[in-house]
Regions:
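Surface-exposed helix-capping loop/turn segments at secondary-structure junctions
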Residues: 25-30, 162
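Glycine/GP-enriched mid-protein hinge/lid loop-to-helix segment characteristic of carbohydrate kinases
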Residues: 4, 8-9, 69-71, 77-79, ...
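Short glycine-rich anion-binding loops that position phosphate/pyrophosphate groups of nucleotides
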Residues: 39-42, 107-109
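Amphipathic alpha-helical linker/stalk segments
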Residues: 2, 24-25
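Glycine-rich phosphate-binding loop and adjoining helix at the ATP-binding site
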Residues: 5-17, 21, 29-34, 41-100
Length: 169
């Protein structure tokens, strides 16, 4: 199921509702919880997006934890997608066996994660390693280096349409 992020936070939430309902219909026992891995800066205690790039309209302020717990009556946890990728690398991937892992992802945005002794390091105000949002030369880092922006720049330099380069991202 495509996210269709351009439709905004409410549309994404509706898709999450549909996915959870479908999954609940397929399993014999009631699920014991829901975990959401999402783009944006996440307040993990509240389970809410406190900042998101403009790629997803009306995403900042989404209260995933509250809305999902209210609807499905089971616990919900929400974490940044790059932090989840960092945990996966730490537990099963290239960082397995290390005490500290620094993870960098490059996709539609640029994200970072620090895992120390098996735990996500969230830092001050849940913003540790949010490298994509670092301010650089009147812009943020992900605007300067994200795959989508690099694709646009390459297509401009080559005088070609972005469509030709989209499959590369």
């Amino acid at each position: 199921m495509k996210t269709e992020a351009e439709k905004g936070g409410s549309a994404i939430l509706e898709k999450v509702f549909v996915i959870v309902e479908k999954l609940q219909g397929r399993i014999q026992e009631k699920a014991s919880g829901i975990c959401i891995s999402t783009a944006g800066m996440v307040n993990t205690e509240q389970g809410a997006i406190f900042y998101s790039a403009p790629l997803i309209p009306n995403y900042t302020g989404m209260q995933f934890k509250k809305l999902l717990e209210d609807k499905f009556k089971i616990p919900c946890e929400v974490e940044n997608d790059v932090n989840c990728a960092g945990l996966a690398e730490y537990r099963s991937g290239a960082a397995k066996g290390s005490h500290v892992a620094l993870i960098l992802t490059i996709g539609t945005g640029i994200g970072g994660s620090i895992i120390m002794d098996g735990e996500v390091y969230h830092g001050f105000s849940n913003s540790a390693c949010e490298v994509g949002y670092m301010h650089m030369n009147d812009s943020d880092f992900q605007t300067l280096g994200a795959a989508s922006i690099l694709t646009k720049k390459v297509s401009e330099w080559k005088g070609e349409t972005e469509k030709k380069w989209e499959r590369m991202t």
